[in-house]
């Protein structure tokens, strides 16, 4: 959860690169929930790049 809340896109990309398809699906599902909480906690942060990464657009 740390890299999502910190908006650490580099770490999230590294995580996704080493996971198999099933693990990646789980990681992305959980990360979406964490991202929603982070956006509420830190409304001034721009999480648009993180959203792209987690949606597979990055």
Question: Where on the chain are the PLM-derived regions?
Answer:
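NAD(P)-dependent Rossmann-like dehydrogenase/reductase catalytic/cofactor-binding core
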Residues: 1-58
């Amino acid at each position: 959860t740390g890299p999502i809340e910190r908006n650490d896109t580099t770490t999230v990309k590294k995580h996704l690169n080493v996971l198999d398809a099933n693990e990646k699906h789980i990681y992305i599902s959980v990360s979406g929930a964490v991202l929603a909480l982070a956006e509420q906690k830190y409304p001034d942060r721009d999480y648009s790049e993180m959203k792209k990464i987690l949606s597979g657009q990055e």
